[in-house]
Design a protein with these regions (language model features):
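Alpha-helix N-cap and loop-to-helix initiation/capping positions
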Residues: 56, 140-151, 185-192, 221-225
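Histidine-centered active-site loop/cap adjacent to the catalytic His
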Residues: 217-243
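Conserved SGNH/GDSL esterase-like catalytic core that processes O-acyl groups on lipids
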Residues: 41-135, 141-145, 154, 220
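Generic structural signal for well-ordered alpha-helices
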Residues: 102, 156-160, 194
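Substrate-gating cap/lid alpha-helix
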Residues: 162, 170-212
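Sec-exported extracytoplasmic/periplasmic mature domains
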Residues: 73, 119, 161-168, 198, ...
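N-terminal secretory targeting modules
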Residues: 1-60, 70-71, 107-109, 165-170, ...
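Structural recognition of the beta-strand scaffold that forms the well-ordered cores
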Residues: 27-31, 36, 76-81, 112-118, ...
Length: 243
């Protein structure tokens, strides 16, 4: 017993000197379109941005992703958002197939969480007669052709497949505007896109955050809309990460 006591005391002294591990800093990346593209806060910096000052969003601190970072204590690894971009590789006038989500999905850094925020342009892109022009395509989950990747459903499936393989450590979230294309497309097309996103996200076990009631000016989230997005994203993260 005399020998055991000093050993226990020594163990307790050593334990007291060991500092607990710091919690791992969580880093997130954004793959998006104009809803997330704020001047000076996109990477690459050559990405097209949206002139948010025209609708009253005067600083990056008012953007949804900044609010999420502030609330959670996370840091943004990369914001690879490009105004006007499609998920798919369809190319028409000012809708740039060369800057699609598929062309940029390999440039997100090393995030722990990836937010994919898009599909608005795929649903709403139109010709001079305001007729939607991006084909929705079929449900294809393997062996995609270049032609199929110029349509929405196969492109979204390929995007999720690639992100799961390229960033296996990352949690994926698709942010879905439930009022997709309000005022610019009919309800049937909107519902077709929303249903397609839900189905493909479910197939790949990508978490879909359905965003309701986003306030907009000129079809883009204004100050209140950015706050609405952030609040609903944070609510979802509170369930998964207890932030």
């Amino acid at each position: 017993m005399k020998k055991i006591v000093p050993i226990i005391a020594l163990f307790l002294m050593m334990s007291a000197c060991v500092k607990p591990d710091k919690p791992k800093e969580i880093r997130f990346s954004v793959l998006g379109d104009s809803y997330s593209a704020y001047e000076g806060f996109v990477d690459p910096e050559t990405n097209d941005v949206y002139p948010y000052e025209n609708i009253g969003v005067k600083s990056a601190e008012q953007m949804w992703w900044h609010k999420v970072a502030t609330k959670t204590g996370w840091s943004m690894e990369k914001n690879n958002s490009f105004s006007g971009s499609l998920v798919c590789n369809f190319d028409y006038v000012h809708y740039y197939g060369s800057y699609s989500f598929l062309r940029r999905m390999n440039d997100l850094g090393s995030p722990d969480v990836i937010f994919i925020f898009g599909a608005t342009n795929d649903a709403c892109a139109h010709n001079g007669d305001y007729v939607p022009i991006v084909p929705i395509g079929d449900y294809v989950y393997a062996d995609w052709t270049e032609e199929q990747l110029c349509t929405f459903r196969p492109a979204l499936a390929y995007l999720f497949e690639y992100l799961n393989q390229m960033y296996p450590q990352a949690e994926l979230y698709f942010l879905l505007d439930m009022d997709l294309g309000s005022g610019s497309i009919d309800v049937d097309r909107r519902d077709l896109f929303i249903g397609s996103i839900h189905r493909i996200a479910s197939y790949y076990k990508v978490k879909c955050i359905d965003l309701e009631g986003i306030q907009k000016s000129q079809w883009h989230p204004n100050v209140d809309g950015q706050e609405t997005i952030a609040r609903q994203v944070i609510e979802a993260l509170q369930i998964d990460f207890n932030v």
